[in-house]
Amino acid sequence: MNHIRNFSIIAHIDHGKSTLADRIIQRCGGLQDREMSAQVLDSMDLEKERGITIKAQTAALKYKARDGQIYNLNLIDTPGHVDFSYEVSRSLSACEGALLVVDASQGVEAQTVANCYTALDLGVEVVPVLNKMDLPQADPENAKQEIEDVIGIDATDAIPCSAKTGMGIDEILEAVIARVPPPKGNPDGALRAMIIDSWYDAYVGVVMLVRVVDGRLAKGDRIKLMASEAMYNAEQLGVFTPHTEPRQSLEAGEVGFVIAGIKELQAARVGDTVTLIKPGTGGAAFTATQALPGFKEIQPQVFAGLYPTEASEYDSLRDALEKLKLNDASLHYEPEVSQALGFGFRCGFLGLLHMEIVQERLEREFDQDLITTAPSVVYEVLKADGEIIKVENPSKIPDAGRVTEIREPIVTVHLYMPQDYVGAVMTLANLKRGVQLNMAYHGKQVMLTYEMPLGEIVLDFFDKLKSVSRGYASMDYEFKEFRASDVVKVDILLNGEKVDALSIIVHRSQSAYRGRAVVAKMREIISRQQFDVAIQAAIGANIIARETIKALRKNVIAKCYGGDISRKRKLLEKQKAGKKRMKQIGSVEVPQEAFLAILQVEE
């Protein structure tokens, strides 16, 4: 066990994690040069295209160190984006060390800090690495200073490297061996292995990625998952060197995969503990009694309705969501019926990027045509009878008379940016009802801390932040509490009928403005009908904005040449009566764009 090192790489988006992982794999001979592709561990097309890492991947490598010993290194790649911080904490809890990669030309950014604190909380040894040293604008001294100021770990011996040219890779590997402690655990004890990740494979069923903590797991063993108490046979074991390499057994301290003929992913919950059942011996000596401390169940922060464009596609959408959930433990969904859109699902996501990626994967990998409603967050509603309910869907909030108060989720937001953009960012944060808590200067970087309602961030805060700071600002946020706030539900009515999927929750101070904006937008989108269509925005029974789409009408008096006015009036009255009848029975088609229009109402 002393020759095993488990480590992962943490960094902000685009600081070069995946390229560094490629170099390390190449240096340890995990892949021949001809198989080397950029970003080996990003296996999803979407990951390569967006240049981000979504799922954690692993590689088991052998490295001959300068002291002549051969070490087994397990590298676990982690995502850098704030929405996937959960994937990061899972990867880190399987490691003893982490390489903190900082772009020497950019310095410390928000997710670097967030992920680094996660690592320090889990007691992982952090080794700072300065990447992109080949760039002419690299400023290693400044970057070291920032690491010490902002994160507070000693960066005097930070390793300079360049993942692009391959400089400093050996130094990194030597540092991992020297500074990262070997795994602790009892190789002779009862088997305990933690599931770090699990995904579904069409041929073999569920594949579990496990980190063996105590004991050993051999091929053919009967295993039990402690949380669900389900039992299986370990049919195949192995490690990824990024390729799959079958093994006869996995020892304590190793990270590898187990295939046990599990049919549904719900059985192999991430964070569960795997242990042995020995046939015939009562299984006591080999079965662990105490599970490993797992992960906290992750709570989705952002909700949106996903509906199929054709009602007949409902079943295939459900299958697609089930399959996606196999690979993505943090996706939540439940069936929902909307009067406007028919049958669909209410889905919970970790954040906006996560939502976009789920939508894109549904459309790409599963060929779904989707209608998505505006994203919303969870509100706590204190009803007049004292009951507290959590509401994910704005249209489900009870009428104003039955509600004592609505509490909205407040998050603590950390914003990092160069000094020049502080003013613009502060203006933006105040617009979004942010309350400034703190402001700190670290060299040329400024860190602002705000409390903001999550509902304000969900719509477009991130995009706006990037545009006011020319892309230099970065952010991360964490949930703080639910707090009572003067928010109201704005309903959109078409000809007096509520369209439930268009309800939005906004702060009272912005309600009239948002109502007007949405109504005006809807007027542009809904096509003209044979009768007048009134589009109204209402808070309860109080109408705050209205637009009318005028009816298309035939010129009924074209056939009268001259003649009496009463003849013309008769025809016009007759037309009017017909339109009135039509309006009573006519229904208005709401096009798909209307649901997205709510998102694009400009501030």
Swiss-Prot record:
Documented EC number(s): 3.6.5.n1
GO cellular component terms listed in the entry, alphabetical order: plasma membrane
Reactions catalysed according to its record: GTP + H2O = GDP + phosphate + H(+)
Residues in tr-type G domain copies: 2-184
Any single Pfam family the record assigns to this protein: LepA_C
Family: Belongs to the TRAFAC class translation factor GTPase superfamily. Classic translation factor GTPase family. LepA subfamily.
Purpose: Required for accurate and efficient protein synthesis under certain stress conditions. May act as a fidelity factor of the translation reaction, by catalyzing a one-codon backward translocation of tRNAs on improperly translocated ribosomes. Back-translocation proceeds from a post-translocation (POST) complex to a pre-translocation (PRE) complex, thus giving elongation factor G a second chance to translocate the tRNAs correctly. Binds to ribosomes in a GTP-dependent manner.
Protein name: Elongation factor 4
Source species of the chain: Polaromonas sp. (strain JS666 / ATCC BAA-500)
Gene behind this protein: lepA
